[in-house]
């Protein structure tokens, strides 16, 4: 996992595998939007909250609470990148789960962009 003390890039939250880092990005976005709405925060430049998530991590319930909070607060500066590698400490993630997950994200009005294959993934971040 990323470390604020060991990595040279900006890493705001170092967390474990229980979905906390994913949820933190949503709530940090809400806080950032609140600060921006105040007179003392209007000059602040908005950042992006990005979480790298394993598909097995989507078993955690707090992630779905964060999805709903994102919908209720119309978040636009929060990105979740889900690595659908079907690996888990407990076993293998079921095939076909990603289609169900996409429907859940759609239901909460999150934009879903599916990127497959290394070349396309690299192009998404150029």
Each language-model region and where it sits:
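Glycine-rich ThDP/TPP pyrophosphate-binding loop and its adjacent helix/strand module
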Residues: 7, 11-126
């Amino acid at each position: 996992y990323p470390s604020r003390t060991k990595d040279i890039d900006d890493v705001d939250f170092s967390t474990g595998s229980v979905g906390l880092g994913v949820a933190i990005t949503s709530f940090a976005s809400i806080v950032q939007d609140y600060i921006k709405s105040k007179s003392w925060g209007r000059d602040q430049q908005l950042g992006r909250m990005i979480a790298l998530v394993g598909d097995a991590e989507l078993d955690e319930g707090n992630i779905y609470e964060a999805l709903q909070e994102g919908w209720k607060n119309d978040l636009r500066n929060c990105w979740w990148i889900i690595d659908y590698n079907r690996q888990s400490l407990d076993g293998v993630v079921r095939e076909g789960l990603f289609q169900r997950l996409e429907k859940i994200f759609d239901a909460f009005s999150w934009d879903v962009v599916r990127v497959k294959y290394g070349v396309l993934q690299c192009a998404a971040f150029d």
